[in-house]
Swiss-Prot record:
Belongs to the class-V pyridoxal-phosphate-dependent aminotransferase family. SerC subfamily. The keyword Amino-acid biosynthesis applies. This is Phosphoserine aminotransferase. It comes from Vibrio parahaemolyticus serotype O3:K6 (strain RIMD 2210633). The gene is serC. The modification N6-(pyridoxal phosphate)lysine is found at K200. Pathway: Amino-acid biosynthesis; L-serine biosynthesis; L-serine from 3-phospho-D-glycerate: step 2/3; Cofactor biosynthesis; pyridoxine 5'-phosphate biosynthesis; pyridoxine 5'-phosphate from D-erythrose 4-phosphate: step 3/5.
Length: 364
């Protein structure tokens, strides 16, 4: 039986929901794109039609993030995990270490990959405040004097932890923004490298973005695959090999959609409203709990637990029947998780809160 998609809200952590308007446009254009009689998936990545798609996508992203001219925007393959290797291979130079700030699972995953190429200097920034998980302020991070760069993950999707400040350092700051890019305003000029897997706030899986400051290009001293070499990708305009053209095209549509919403500043206002609505309800309830201190709560990923964990399966089943999809928490932490990326409308979060109220009344 076909479900009314107007009443379905997808809370998946990634691949995540795409804006409905983007999906509808892609659907309309799928078979006959721009009157060519073919799909955008079927044309050459070096055709003038696709070159225009690529150039517009880059310019729109530059506009949205106010990216300075001395940064390259690279459309990469391999997702953020490929960047876990690309970062040390491109940035270490003659150095033997880099400082990695450990704020959670994904930061730790980056460390494990970096160990293949250097001896990471790991600073554990995790702490507790009033019995809740938190992260030490950046002013307290210890950065090795000999570090080639400082790497951190501003948003941990699994734990629902967000880091909102930056250290004062002369080292290049590298940020894995896979789950937070385009969700709030940032000053790109404070970073050396920003990278992000696409499948949360950019587009479908299969592509990643790397924003690299010009002076960090060409530093690689180690042998590294050309496909991961920032300098090669910059020189070839992200077309060293055949790129994932459909993912690139869809990402471009998302950028245009976001500009139509008023840009990052406007979407940040909506994102803060969505997060406040959900956190406020959880905090006033004795039936639901979020274990992250308010100072480090994620705007994008809201994990929560039931007072009666034995009801988890029932909660998920009934939520799914209401059109509230993909609320199961990550296997590492269990419970529930609502991922409320840019494409999630306020109405979706309100529908979730209404369901949570109803469930609490029936099962508390």
């Amino acid at each position: 039986m076909e479900q009314n998609t107007d009443n379905v809200f997808n809370f998946s952590a990634g691949p995540a929901a795409l804006p409905k308007a983007v999906m509808q446009q892609a659907q309309q254009e799928l078979i006959d794109w721009q009157g060519l009689g073919t799909s955008v998936m079927e044309i050459s990545h070096r055709s003038k039609e696709f070159i225009k798609v690529a150039q517009e996508a880059e310019q729109d992203l530059r506009d949205l993030l106010n990216i300075p001219d001395n940064y390259k925007v690279l459309f990469c393959q391999g997702g953020a995990r490929a960047q876990f290797a690309a970062v040390p291979l491109n940035l270490l130079g003659d150095a033997e270490t880099a400082t990695y700030i450990d704020g959670g699972y994904w930061a730790e995953s980056a460390v494990e990959e970096a160990k293949k190429y250097c001896e990471p200097d790991v600073f554990d920034a995790k702490t507790e405040i009033d019995g809740k998980v938190a992260v030490l302020p950046a002013s307290e991070w210890k950065i090795a004097p000999e570090a080639a760069y400082v790497h951190f993950c501003p948003n941990e999707t699994i734990d629902g932890i967000e880091i909102n400040d930056l250290p004062i350092t002369d080292k290049p700051i590298v940020a894995d923004m896979s789950s937070t890019i385009l969700s709030r305003e940032i000053d790109v000029s404070k970073y050396g490298v920003i990278y992000a897997g696409a499948q949360k706030n950019i587009g479908p899986s299969g592509i990643a973005i790397a924003i690299v400051r010009d002076d960090l290009l060409g530093m690689a001293k180690q042998v590294l695959p050309s496909i991961l070499d920032y300098k090669v990708l910059a020189e070839k305009e992200s077309m060293f090999n055949t790129p994932p053209t459909f993912a690139w095209y869809l990402s471009g549509l998302v950028f245009k959609w976001l500009k139509a919403q008023g840009g990052v500043k406007s979407i940040e206002t909506v994102n803060r409203e969505k997060a406040k609505l959900l956190y406020d309800y959880i905090d006033q309830s004795d039936f639901y709990r979020n274990g992250v201190h308010p100072s480090n709560r994620s705007l994008m990923n809201v994990p929560f637990q039931l007072a009666k964990p034995e009801l988890d399966a029932t909660f998920l089943e009934l939520a799914d029947a209401k059109g509230l999809k993909a609320l199961k928490g990550h296997r590492v932490v269990g419970g529930m998780r609502a991922s409320i990326y840019n494409a999630m409308p306020l109405e979706g979060v309100q529908a979730l809160v209404d369901f949570m109220k109803e469930f609490e009344q029936n099962y508390a």
